[in-house]
Amino acid sequence: MRAYRVAYDGQPYHGFQRQPDVDTVEGRLRSALVRLGVCERGEGLPDRYAAAGRTDAGVSARTQTVAFDAPAWLSPAAFNGELPNDVRVWASADVPEDFHATHDAAERTYTYYLYAPADADRPEHEPVDDGRWADAVDALAGTHDFHNLTTDETGTERTVAIDWTRDGQFLVVQLTAGGFCRQLVRRLVSLAAAVADGSAPLSKVDRILSPEPVSGPDGVPPAPPEPLVLTDVRYPNVSFTRDEDAAVDARTVFARRRATARTTARVADHITDGL
């Protein structure tokens, strides 16, 4: 039984979990395992397979974790040989036979890179007040019933820790919990951002956290998925070993993507600033 750390760019995919007729990260992992002879053709997955989480369409990951009965020779580098460049396995760990990648995760951390300029000369975005942002985050952190911030109908009481820092025109937001309801991270960010830019009063946080259902125009839409990354999944007593060749390969792949994205942003800056 072995667990693998997987990094991926989620933007081209319809989420992590396999779905019929659409491209998903898990579907790519399974196809690679079929070609490697680890998984039989058909619809099944390897014995005792489980994943740490189900990221939404457009959401990326640095430490998605999958575990299953794997042959000794299946190193991260061997796995990568059958995967697309935007899905990279970079570490692994031998785990007990009863290990479950979903249920045994003690904590999951997501990082959201919120574009939030504080200056008022950005016509494409309302200026963000860091003080209002902090007030909203303080009110949302802790243990609450988040039923108004998820599409889930049960299991909506969670304890969420929220840390954040300003990095230039971005607020880098880290949210940690034992587990998250569906869309909870993105809706938490969306609500705090609405308070921070003045489009919603701070009192809306209390209303959203109240027992009364809030939906429709008064509800909270999810923030866009593309700035969200699954950045850590912690398992007690599991120590992952980085495959240096696979890690170098993954860094190279994502460095190229970073360069492309920065070039695209620079071109957009040039056009925007010249109009």
Swiss-Prot record:
InterPro entries: PsdUridine_synth_cat_dom_sf, PsdUridine_synth_TruA, PsdUridine_synth_TruA_a/b_dom, PsdUridine_synth_TruA_C, TruA/RsuA/RluB/E/F_N. Its EC number is 5.4.99.12. Substrate binds at Y110. It is an enzyme of class 5 (isomerase). The active site is at D56 (nucleophile). Disulfide bonds: none annotated. Transmembrane segments: none annotated. The keyword Repressor does not apply. Formation of pseudouridine at positions 38, 39 and 40 in the anticodon stem and loop of transfer RNAs. Belongs to the tRNA pseudouridine synthase TruA family. NCBIfam families: PRK00021.3-3. This is tRNA pseudouridine synthase A. It comes from Haloarcula marismortui (strain ATCC 43049 / DSM 3752 / JCM 8966 / VKM B-1809).
